[in-house]
Amino acid sequence: MRVCFYTLGCKVNLNETGALEQLFRANGFTIAQEGEAADVFIVNSCTVTNFGDQKSRKWLRRKKRENPGAVTVLTGCYPQAFPEEAAQFMEADLVCGNGDRKAILENVQKLLDGHERIVAIAPHQRGEQFEELPVERFETHTRAFIKVEDGCNRQCAYCVIPRARGPVRSRAEESILAELHQLAAAGYREVVLSAISLPSYGLDTGTNLVELVEKCAQVPGIERIRLGSLDPDMLTPKFISRLAAVDKLCPQFHLSLQSGCTATLRRMRRVYTAQEYAQVVEQIRAAYGSRPVSFTTDCICGFPGETAEDFEESCEFLKKIGFLKVHVFPYSRRSGTPAYDFPDQIHEREKQERSRHMNAVAEQVRRETLAAFEGTEDEVLLETPLSGTLFTGYTRLYIPVVVSAPGCESGQIVRVKLGRYDGERVRAALC
């Protein structure tokens, strides 16, 4: 039997798909790639935008049309957040949410045996436990992603994720550390702690993210630890100083911004101001002292009520911080969120224009930030081999580089001197 997966959305979704692939493989299935024939087609959906829902439905419709005898599965955040709507999508033989993922295999086997269509979407509940879905292999044999938390307790005006993912649920430290030991033994040198709300780790279990990072750093063989997205309001001075003391922690912080304008942040129902965000950045820089540190972020433009002045203020804030990378998103009006009904919606054409302008600002800031690192040294984890001795990789600061490394191999960490940015990567040379 062959099964084909299609994944939309975040790194957590990719991690969960990897776990499902592992589960199906262990039970005799072969993983088919896109475009190949299969007996089962599974879409792990993302519901951050209405467009994501449409992409999931479109993919399954096409697979059902091309493979009328195959079993089709709609799982993930879309059916979890909008169960009644998803249940009416008849091209899916199995519709299930993002809880009890291991039951997907059992239900698929029932359908292969002739069972009628199955809809199995259980709502998230307070007090439910983290679902263990370990992954043993990743696309590249260099960086591993470990899911340590699920759920979000926040209520941002534009976001449907709390509805899709439920309340905060933390994975047990013992389970995380056991997986880390397995990954180290398999040759992985860098791990990324991923989550839906990473700084919320431990809120439900009496521990915290800093303690987890400190324990992860003690695992032999793991040389670099990287953090997923962080909310600035949850980073206290003590939290920051303890993180800065962990040598294995990569000094690259993805601090969720969403807007550099305080008025817009308030409408978004974010719980910090632009000034408070900037203060956290300065606290992190102060904690690292003379050691270099980098910042990446996400920013939304065209949120309801955002004036031209608000937008310019947000762009100026990007320059003020000096981000290494900014992921810019035009606001997507998501049904099921408070912001969907907000007045003063921005016209789509204006949102796209603001997005183009902000991307240009972000790219200029990126060039200036990378220019400041030219001539400095850093360590690079060699990843994809190109032609001959050329490798791509990332520094501890998450600077993408290309370097000639004769005699080296993928997964090796080497020290390099950073050169010029070519618009895609920084040219580097071995020290």
Predicted segments, located by residue:
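Proteins enriched for Cys/Gly/acidic motifs involved in redox and nucleic-acid/cofactor modification
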Residues: 1-200, 238, 249, 253, ...
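Conserved glycine-rich "GG(E/T)P / GGGxP" loop and the immediately following alpha-helix
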Residues: 47-52, 188-215, 219, 231-238, ...
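Charged helix-capping and loop-helix junction motifs
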Residues: 57-59, 173, 206-212, 273, ...
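Catalytic cores of alpha/beta
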Residues: 83-87, 235-242, 303-320
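Conserved strand-turn element in the central/C-terminal portion of the radical SAM core barrel
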Residues: 155, 159-166, 198, 224-233, ...
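Radical SAM/AdoMet-radical enzyme domain recognition
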Residues: 185, 210-211, 218-224, 235-297
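Hydrophobic, well-ordered secondary-structure elements that form the walls
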Residues: 255, 298, 318, 326, ...
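Terminal RNA-binding accessory module
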Residues: 341-431
